[in-house]
Amino acid sequence: MLRSHGRSNPAFQIGAKTVSVDTAPPMAKHTLFTGSTAAWTAAGLGLAFAAHRLKRDLDTPGRPWKDGKTVGREYDAWTEEKILEHYWGEHIHLGYYSDDDLAKGAGTLLGCKVKDFIEAKLDFCDEMLAWSECPDKPAKVLDVGCGIGGTSRHLAKTFGSGTQVTGITLSPKQVERATELAKEQNLPNASFRVMNALEMEFPADTFDLVWACESGEHMPDKRKYVEEMVRVLKPGGRLVIATWCQRSTPPAFTEEDLVNLDYLYKEWAHPYFISIEDYASLVEGTTTMRDVDTNDWTRQTIASWRHSIWAGVWDPIPVFSRPNIWYKTLRDIVCLERMRRAFGRGLMQYGMIKGVKVKASR
């Protein structure tokens, strides 16, 4: 081992002989420092290349919509991984933040202690229900795109045992988990089925309330999606939809807008989005609905995107302890942030649509 006495005098090995840098031949000094510089340069270039490659990969959407099975498989995987359930709880949708919540910093890194992420989702359900103006005790409720059944069970608890809530999803794993949680929570009035929302197996005029929270994003035919929900709704029943929407046009989308929308379509298996106004037109176009109304809840929900990221910062162990999901989680974080920015600059909007059915379906 080499030791230094007093002033630093670097040394290196030539053959079996240790040579001081100060007394080394000029060519040896040149070789030493040139080699070190080359090594550091190569390392720097390697890191730069790796960073460029990673950014390119993260900016390239990797989970495009292909068919309904694509959506079912994605949610099957998320359900089995349990990471989404750990951070998002039983509700796979955004939360609701009042002006007072936002003023206190809810949804920020430190604001995670102001309002719990899962609490925000329960608040969303209650606010959506109030906005729907649904009668107090509907006999039958349909939850379209129910996930693992968080909202279905919340509605079953809210309305009581006299209300039967049915949730449908394309994911068999979600139905399994939703059913398991309903049994654990002693909620026999909440049931779940694997079913395509575009081809529902229910008779016309069945439900008093049809509830669709963040399921329209995955629908390849928005018109059919709306028409099917209206078909199974009873006369006098209420339809309420919460969904991510792209802004209306004009003005036309810029090239940057189109690039961002393409990413948001293809990273989380969305065929396409439509505007809030387009949804209202589809509901009105069924000719059996009245009192169609809309709202934009971007302000009330936008904090959710980063809130979900900060929840992981405060509680990273579930991800760090499972290296096999690091990359997928990183991709999801990137998409969450890109969603937040798209909503923040008005490219995306959080659409709320409701209406009352006035006559029976043919």
List PLM regions with ranges:
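Class I SAM-dependent methyltransferase SAM/SAH-binding core
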Residues: 140-142, 148-199
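N-terminal auxiliary segments of SAM/dcSAM-dependent transferases
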Residues: 31-87
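Substrate-binding/catalytic lobe of Class I Rossmann-like enzymes that use SAM or dcSAM, i.e.
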Residues: 252-350, 358-359
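Conserved alpha-helix/loop element of class I SAM-dependent methyltransferases that forms part
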Residues: 96-108, 118-139
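A short acidic, Gly/Pro-enriched loop at the edge of an enzyme's catalytic core
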Residues: 198-210
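A short glycine-rich, Lys/Arg-flanked "PGG" loop and its adjoining helix->strand segment in the class I
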Residues: 223-238
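Acidic carboxylate diad motif detector
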Residues: 241-243
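A short SAM/SAH-binding and catalytic strip from SAM-dependent methyltransferases
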Residues: 208-221
